[in-house]
């Protein structure tokens, strides 16, 4: 099993998602790197937040590429793995007309997500939907941060401080 999701895999997943015509945003470590405009570290997986109405269609597309479900915590998240492409962690959202969204939490409640948290950034010449710089901190809560999460937040803090000086 491939233990990292590299830049080529990210491009392949982005092409798949773009071809589906659904709303999605890259989250997690790759989401931070997209905001930074550079890859700062290796990534275990690609986190994808998406319009939950496409859950079955997205799962079929991923399974058709050879991914298999390894963790199924529906409706919160589904993790899939591929022997050559690594891991992808998909998070179905319920998207409101105003652009805000909700994600089911594991205890049966909901996380409420503000419309302005959904953004995009340019990474290697490609405009990619992602969770905004300001929303990355709330998205990195609710669990014990790993060392890579702490580094991601430090990199994001440095990036945001640089933006304040522009």
Q: Model regions: which residues?
A:
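Short, acidic/polar N-cap/turn motifs at the starts of alpha helices
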Residues: 14, 75-78, 117-120
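Anion (oxyanion) recognition and catalysis
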Residues: 18, 63, 122
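Conserved catalytic core of two-metal-ion nucleotidyltransferases
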Residues: 67-101
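Short, solvent-exposed loop/turn segments at secondary-structure junctions
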Residues: 31-32, 95-96, 135-137
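Short amphipathic alpha-helices in soluble, non-transmembrane regions
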Residues: 58-64
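Helical scaffold of the NTase/Pol beta-like nucleotidyltransferase catalytic core
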Residues: 1-26, 154-166
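Active-site nucleotide-donor binding segment shared across nucleotidyl transfer reactions
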Residues: 14-46, 51, 57, 132
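Catalytic cores of NTP-dependent nucleotidyl/adenyl transfer enzymes across multiple folds
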Residues: 103-166
């Amino acid at each position: 099993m491939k233990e990292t999701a590299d830049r080529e895999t990210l491009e392949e997943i982005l092409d798949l998602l773009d071809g589906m015509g659904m709303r999605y945003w890259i989250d997690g470590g790759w989401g931070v790197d997209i905001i930074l405009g550079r890859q700062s570290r290796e990534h275990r997986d690609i986190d994808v937040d998406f319009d939950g109405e496409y859950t079955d269609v997205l799962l079929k597309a991923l399974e058709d590429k050879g991914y298999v479900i390894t963790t199924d915590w529906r409706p919160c998240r589904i993790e899939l793995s591929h022997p050559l492409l690594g891991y992808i962690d998909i998070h179905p959202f319920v998207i409101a007309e105003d652009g805000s969204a909700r994600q089911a939490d594991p205890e049966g409640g909901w996380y409420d997500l503000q419309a302005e948290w959904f953004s995009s950034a340019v990474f290697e010449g490609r405009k990619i939907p992602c969770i905004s710089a300001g929303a990355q901190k709330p998205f990195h809560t609710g669990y014990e941060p790993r060392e890579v999460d702490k580094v991601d937040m430090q990199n994001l803090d440095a990036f945001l401080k640089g933006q304040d000086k522009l």
